[in-house]
Amino acid sequence: MRPSAPPSSMTSHGLLRRRAVALALVAAPALWLGARAQPAPGLRATPAQTEGPFYPVVFPEDSDYDLLRNGALNYPEGQGAWLEGSVSDLAGRPVAGAQVEIWQCDHSGHYHHPGEGARADRRFQGFGRVTVAADGRYRFRTIRPVPYSGRTPHIHVKVRQGARELLTTQVYVADDPGNPRDFLWRSLGAADRAALTVAFAPGGDGLRASFPIVVAA
C-alpha cells in the first residue's frame, strides 16, 4: 500500500490547481474578446472627407430614405439611382442602430441651404437619414449626382451612433470626366480613391451604386 501524501501537500496542490482553473476561466473571455476586436483581414476604415458648406441648417420634415419624394411631391428630374451598402466596424461586425445621412444637390446643382437662397427644387428632398438594420444594411433612393461649379459629381455621407459622429465623407462616380479636375478627389491617394469612387450601374429600377462603409466604432 502506497503511503498517502501529507495533508499539507494535498491542500497546497489542490489550491494551486483551483487557482490555475480560475485564472484560465477569467483569461479565456478576455482573449476571445481581444481576438474579436482585431481588424478583419483586408478591412480598413473608410476615408474621411470634409463636410463641406451645405450640410442642412434646417432638416426637411420628410427626411427618410427616398430623396425623390418630398412629402407629397415627386421629383422627376435626373437619373434615378439607389445608393446602398453596409456599415461595419474594423472587425467586420455590423454596426446595427447607427444612422446614415446623405445630402446632395438637385439636378440643377443647388442644395437646400440658406447659402443657395431658394434656388433648390422643393420637389427634391435633398437630405435623407436611415437607421442601419441588424445586418448593417442601409439604402437610399436618389439621383445620380451631378456636377456644379468647381465640383465633380458627389454625394455627402455622414454616419452617427447616438451622439457620436463616426464618419463624414463623400462618394464619387466612377469614370466621371470631372474627377481628375476636382481638388478633393485629386487629394486622395489611390486606395482612398478606390474606397470612395463607386460605379452607378444600370438596374431594373434605376441606377445602382454599392458603397460599403467601415468605421472605427
Regions inferred by a protein language model and the residue ranges of each:
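Polar low-complexity intrinsically disordered regions
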Residues: 1-12, 37-39, 52, 152
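N-terminal secretory signal peptides and thylakoid transit peptides that target proteins
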Residues: 2-29
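N-terminal signal peptide c-region/cleavage motif recognized by signal peptidases
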Residues: 32-34
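Beta-strand-dominated extracellular/periplasmic modules and repeats
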Residues: 38-197, 202-217
